[in-house]
From Swiss-Prot:
Key words of the record: Membrane, NAD, NADP, Plastoquinone, Quinone, Thylakoid, Translocase, Transmembrane, Transmembrane helix
Transmembrane segments: 24-44, 56-76, 108-128, 132-152, 156-176, 188-208, 232-252, 263-283, 297-317, 326-346, 352-372, 396-416, 437-457, 484-504
Record protein name field: NAD(P)H-quinone oxidoreductase chain 4
Reaction(s) the record says it catalyses: a plastoquinone + NADH + (n+1) H(+)(in) = a plastoquinol + NAD(+) + n H(+)(out); a plastoquinone + NADPH + (n+1) H(+)(in) = a plastoquinol + NADP(+) + n H(+)(out)
Listed Pfam families: Proton_antipo_M
GO molecular-function term, one example from the UniProt record: NADH dehydrogenase (ubiquinone) activity
Single GO BP term: electron transport coupled proton transport
HAMAP family found in the cross-reference section: NDH1_NuoM (MF_00491)
Family under the similarity heading: Belongs to the complex I subunit 4 family.
Membrane-protein topology: Multi-pass membrane protein
Gene Ontology cellular component annotations, sorted alphabetically: plasma membrane-derived thylakoid membrane
Intracellular or extracellular location(s): Cellular thylakoid membrane
Main localisation: membrane
Length: 546
């Protein structure tokens, strides 16, 4: 009851703020509030198991989520394709750096997703007893930093926000991870920090382009007439940087290692939010700011997306480690994001956006269940699991529901997003018919493999060859109320979006249509080839209004 009254009071307060203060800085508060509160955690007493810190972190995460919801309810117009909730302050004018935040259709769904997943990750971290103050300090820093990635409207500020989450993730892996945590954490920081240099170089090049006074704001960069060769150089660098985070094969090898050592709440943040930063950045920078280069590299994105789907699905099928199996499954599903971004239809690009939201929810749910299962069985080897279905019937039901969501069962969000990507790409006349048929047919292989490895995984965990150490363990318990609540919170939007996609798609249709129009203008100048259909690229397939 107390949580109900707290939520009701918070929503009432947020609504009041929106009415009384029309220019309330929603996004700045969403970013700075969790970061500022994180620096209060060191003042908490060290005694006990960190109960006060846990409740404080959960309260901060919930308030941050409610503030982001308030920003959507009170100040966001779904029919407006432009940046809204804009806040701009000259921060370091001599360096051309401004505190510029805002939200459009591409960023608002991911801002909401970030605050929602983080709040559930804090609840998932309830059993953490080792250094709880540092753990929740890092989680709250990540919360503000990841919201900033989606909200900032300045490329240099974007780079700083992108870098802000590196150290928290490194420490969360290196301190609370498994036995190979140091290797996984080091590999993560080498891949992500090393590739980030391309973001900085591209930001500096674009900000100083054609002027002695730098300007890194997205609105300015979008109106710059960058030359073709300049766009290609920036595009390649940004593709590498964002491809590491997405991740794109073969830049993916850090992810299975990171997931293999992470704890459940860190899993949720990695799969639910971190990977989406790469997909969002590809749309924001490569597709929106570099349209000429994007038109030339889009076929490569399609091919890379198909490679992601097939390679990762085959690799997941062969994995005997539960965490690594789900990690490769995530890589496979992110391939649909690449195909959607590479398509020149609003339907396909809208599907890519929906896939990011959908996979954020589904990936977080699966990895939370992986952590919950490991806490009980103390093993990740599928060969050592089995026969626990009779003792963990509720856990089996939760696993089944989330696995069905992952294999894109109709009525769940994954089905809608993948169908939109497939339909948008196949019916897109920008590409030649043979190219579309070949790529779609290859991608379908991965779609067929997904239910095979997921359902066989369920059978091995719960109904495989019995492990007497597990089946006879009196301490092997079924799902707890906290765990059921977390999965229920994730399944509710998964099913809701699957039954009524407009819950999400309406928020970004205007922005996506504008983006695709911009890219199609660049495609018109590309001659007919074995991949491009030439003059047929004047058409645009609008996203659905279902």
């Amino acid at each position: 009851m107390s949580s109900y009254f707290f939520t009701h009071f918070a929503l009432h307060t947020i609504g009041t703020l929106g009415g009384v203060i029309p220019d309330f800085p929603w996004l700045s508060v969403s970013i700075l509030f969790p970061i500022g509160c994180a620096f209060l955690i060191p003042f908490f007493p060290d005694k006990g198991e960190g109960k006060e810190v846990r409740w404080f972190a959960l309260s901060v995460a919930l308030i941050t989520f409610l503030v982001t919801v308030g920003s959507y309810i009170n100040g966001f117009d779904i029919n407006n394709e432009d940046v809204q909730l804009k806040e701009s302050i000259n921060w370091l004018p001599n360096l051309g750096l401004t505190w510029s935040v805002g939200a459009d259709g591409m960023s608002m769904p991911l801002i909401l997703l970030t605050s929602f997943i983080t709040a559930l990750a804090v609840l998932a971290a309830w059993p953490v007893k080792f250094k709880p103050k540092l753990f929740f300090f890092l989680i709250l820093i990540m919360d503000g930093g990841q919201i900033a990635v989606f909200a900032v409207q300045d490329m240099l500020l974007f780079f700083l926000s992108w870098e802000l989450e590196l150290l928290p993730v490194y420490l969360l892996l290196a301190i609370w991870g498994g036995k190979n945590r140091q290797y996984a954490a080091t590999k993560f920081i080498i891949y992500t920090a090393g590739s980030s240099i391309f973001i900085l170089l591209a930001a500096l090049a674009m900000g100083f382009y054609g002027t002695e006074v730098p300007n890194f704001e997205f609105s300015h960069l979008a109106n710059q007439d960058f030359g073709q060769n300049f766009q290609i150089l920036c595009y390649i660098g940004l593709l590498i940087a964002f491809g590491v985070k997405l991740p794109i094969v073969p830049l993916h090898t850090w992810l299975p290692d990171a997931h293999g050592e992470a704890t459940a709440p860190v899993h949720m943040l990695l799969a639910g939010i971190l990977l989406k930063m790469g997909g969002y950045a590809l749309l924001r920078f490569n597709a929106q700011l570099l349209p000429i280069a994007h038109a030339q590299f889009s076929p490569l994105l399609i091919v890379l997306g198909v490679v992601n789907i097939i390679y990762a699905a085959l690799t997941s099928f062969a994995q005997r480690n539960l965490k690594r199996k789900i990690a490769y499954s995530s890589i496979s599903h992110m391939g649909f994001v690449l195909i959607g971004i590479g398509s020149f239809s609003s339907l396909g690009t809208s599907g890519a956006m929906l896939q990011m939201v959908s996979h954020g929810l589904i990936g977080a749910s699966l990895f939370f269940l992986v952590g919950a299962t490991y806490d009980r069985t103390k093993t990740l080897k599928l060969d050592e699991m089995g026969g626990v279905g009779q003792k963990m019937r509720i856990m089996f039901a939760l696993w089944t529901a989330c696995s069905l969501a992952s294999l894109a069962l109709p009525g769940m969000s994954g089905f809608v997003s993948e169908l939109m990507v497939f339909t948008g790409f196949v019916t897109d006349e920008v590409y030649t018919l043979p190219f579309r048929v070949i790529m779609a047919s290859l991608a379908a292989i991965g779609v067929i493999l997904t239910p095979i490895y997921l359902l066989s995984m369920l059978r091995e965990i719960f109904f495989g060859k019995e492990n007497p150490k597990l089946t006879e363990d009196k301490n092997l318990i079924d799902a707890e109320p906290r765990e059921i609540y977390i999965i229920a919170c994730l399944l509710l939007p998964i099913i809701g979006i699957g039954l009524y996609p407009r819950l999400v798609t309406e928020s970004y249709l205007a922005t996506i249509n504008n983006l695709v129009d911009r890219d199609l203008n660049a495609v018109k100048n590309i001659p007919k080839t074995n991949v491009f259909a030439g003059n047929k690229s004047n058409q645009i397939l609008k996203a659905p209004t279902i």
